[in-house]
Regions:
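RecA-like P-loop NTPase motor core of helicase/translocase proteins
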Residues: 1-154
Length: 154
């Protein structure tokens, strides 16, 4: 894990990092480690998106519910002698920039949020002045053709 992060950090402009791991091998745990490493590098805002809402619920439990047996962090989380909190947010405008702020959504939900702006929701403007990390599980679904799009082409 440290080798991967060291290689990643040595790039001039790291743009993407992919972990190809089998089901049940600890991808979510690796993702939690990456979030903590990126926090130390100054990143505070994360968008976690997947193709299905039940994966979101499992991930929320792993990241936010300290009473869950699958919770991935210590009960008290400290980085550089500073206590921080992992919070679910709807946008980054009012988020505490000392905490780890995560928007959990589906791919479809992210598209909808960005293209149908609502008050206190995530917008394209959030990307203009903030460092935001995009995290995805089940990445093989991200570039896949939709059924609707495939039917149109056929």
């Amino acid at each position: 894990f440290n080798f991967v992060l060291n290689q990643y950090n040595q790039r001039k402009k790291p743009t993407q990092l992919l972990f190809h791991m089998a089901t049940g091998s600890g991808k979510t745990l690796v993702m939690a480690g990456v979030i903590l490493d990126l926090y130390e590098q100054g990143y505070r805002n994360f968008i976690f998106f997947v193709n299905s809402s039940n994966i979101i619920e499992k991930t929320k439990d792993n990241f936010l519910n300290s009473l869950s047996s699958k919770y991935l962090f210590n009960e008290t989380l400290s980085i550089a002698d500073k206590q921080i909190t992992i919070k679910e947010v709807d946008n980054f405008e009012t988020a505490n920039q000392e905490d780890i702020n995560i928007v959990f959504t589906t791919i479809q939900g992210l598209h909808s949020r960005l293209n149908t702006p609502k008050e206190n929701a995530l917008t394209y403007e959030d990307f203009e002045d903030k460092k935001i990390v995009l995290l995805s599980d089940e990445a093989h679904h991200i570039n896949a053709e939709t059924k609707k799009g495939k039917n149109t082409i056929d």
